[in-house]
């Protein structure tokens, strides 16, 4: 394998000494851009295969292993799988991924989807009833699996349960009888690849997508949720309270609890009024 001189401008020595969280983000992104987005076009015969196809990802995973970093996490297993698939293609093998094309939902399944999308409401008052940790984890898992630009994997989550912790986050509504999930990001990962300069909008899209998934899963579990945003002062307080580095930034927060209100569902404009045509 011909090793690249640098990856995103980083030498092998720099990659060997890099913070594991940042290296992980670079691996995610390089596997995505150099293998994942190309492999299916290659398999379909729409694109030729380069002799070095997948070698950057293989090089990075070799560094990860040489550093003795764990390989059992799902995201790292995903990376290793793509590296193996790329190697197989590169050496003339044939792939059978065992995956299936999407199929339309059944009418019964669509009823659930419609209930999830069109019945969800923002809930701001909650019963004095604790939310089990098991449900909180399910909600956060949904946020983790939201679409994420370039698969970098910068999103982090903080759970506040105590009233004194709620005060760290500026909110324009009362916050009580709930848990607060704060969607955060490790900006070091974006900056390591200059995404904060090249695609700064991705930062906010990633946080918004995570918050939306959190709200949808909360609704599916019979809980209520309300998505709110906050500014730099809140970011500083949260960072200081948790004792985290300056690159750790909170973006939005979602309050979640057992509903104690049934508000009228807000309505939107007519569909034809919002579709722009020439």
Model-found features: residue ranges?
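Acidic, surface-exposed loops and disordered segments
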Residues: 1-278
């Amino acid at each position: 394998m011909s090793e690249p001189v640098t990856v995103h401008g980083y030498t092998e020595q720099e990659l060997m000494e890099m913070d594991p969280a940042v290296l992980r983000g670079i691996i995610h992104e390089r596997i995505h851009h150099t293998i994942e987005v190309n492999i299916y076009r290659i398999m379909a015969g729409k694109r030729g295969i380069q002799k070095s196809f997948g070698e950057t990802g293989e090089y990075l995973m070799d560094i990860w292993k040489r550093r003795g970093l764990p390989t059992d996490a799902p995201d790292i297993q995903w990376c290793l799988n793509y590296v193996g698939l790329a190697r197989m293609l590169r050496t003339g093998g044939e792939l059978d991924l065992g995956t299936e094309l999407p199929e339309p939902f059944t009418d019964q399944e669509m009823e659930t989807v419609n209930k999830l999308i069109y019945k969800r409401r923002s809930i701001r008052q909650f019963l004095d009833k604790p939310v089990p940790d098991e449900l909180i984890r399910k909600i956060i898992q949904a946020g983790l699996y939201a679409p994420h630009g370039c698969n970098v994997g910068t999103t982090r989550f903080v759970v506040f349960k105590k009233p004194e912790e709620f005060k760290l986050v500026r909110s324009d509504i009362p916050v009580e009888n709930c848990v607060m999930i704060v969607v955060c990001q490790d900006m070091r990962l974006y900056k390591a690849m200059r995404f904060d300069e090249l695609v700064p909008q991705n930062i906010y899209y990633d946080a918004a997508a995570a918050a939306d998934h959190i709200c949808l899963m909360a609704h599916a579990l019979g809980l209520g949720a309300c998505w709110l945003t906050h500014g730099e002062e809140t970011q500083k307080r949260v960072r200081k309270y948790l004792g985290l580095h300056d690159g750790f930034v909170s973006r939005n927060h979602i309050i979640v609890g057992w509903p104690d209100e049934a508000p009228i569902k807000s309505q939107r404009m007519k569909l034809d009024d919002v579709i722009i045509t020439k």
